[in-house]
């Protein structure tokens, strides 16, 4: 598969990037090589390969779900301007 000079110029316009003649030639070559590699990958026979979600059979070890901090509600509410029944009171912003 190849990409034409016109395709590169069209994509450059759509992407709003400026490319000059030398860059278009280099991009044409580089993108052609990339598309050739994609064609090679597409041609590989993967019928006997079992699909997988991750290449490693490792399971992430999670920490236990336990409380690690003490309850400091009273200390925080002691320095708050206004509280009531354990809740913070704030000024009304919607009438």
Curated annotation (Swiss-Prot):
Gene3D superfamilies in alphabetical order: Glu-tRNAGln amidotransferase C subunit, N-terminal domain
EC main group: ligase
Enzyme Commission number(s): 6.3.5.-
Keywords associated with the record: ATP-binding, Ligase, Nucleotide-binding, Protein biosynthesis
Keyword Nucleotide-binding in annotation: yes
Membrane-spanning parts: none
GO MF annotation terms: asparaginyl-tRNA synthase (glutamine-hydrolyzing) activity; ATP binding; glutaminyl-tRNA synthase (glutamine-hydrolyzing) activity
SUPFAM superfamilies: Glu-tRNAGln amidotransferase C subunit
Domain of life: Bacteria
Pfam families listed in its UniProt record: GatC
Key word DNA repair present: no
GO annotation terms (biological process): glutaminyl-tRNAGln biosynthesis via transamidation; regulation of translational fidelity; translation
Reaction(s) the record says it catalyses: L-glutamyl-tRNA(Gln) + L-glutamine + ATP + H2O = L-glutaminyl-tRNA(Gln) + L-glutamate + ADP + phosphate + H(+); L-aspartyl-tRNA(Asn) + L-glutamine + ATP + H2O = L-asparaginyl-tRNA(Asn) + L-glutamate + ADP + phosphate + 2 H(+)
InterPro entries on file: Asp/Glu-ADT_sf_sub_c, GatC
Function field: Allows the formation of correctly charged Asn-tRNA(Asn) or Gln-tRNA(Gln) through the transamidation of misacylated Asp-tRNA(Asn) or Glu-tRNA(Gln) in organisms which lack either or both of asparaginyl-tRNA or glutaminyl-tRNA synthetases. The reaction takes place in the presence of glutamine and ATP through an activated phospho-Asp-tRNA(Asn) or phospho-Glu-tRNA(Gln).
Family: Belongs to the GatC family.
Subunit structure: Heterotrimer of A, B and C subunits.
The protein's name: Aspartyl/glutamyl-tRNA(Asn/Gln) amidotransferase subunit C
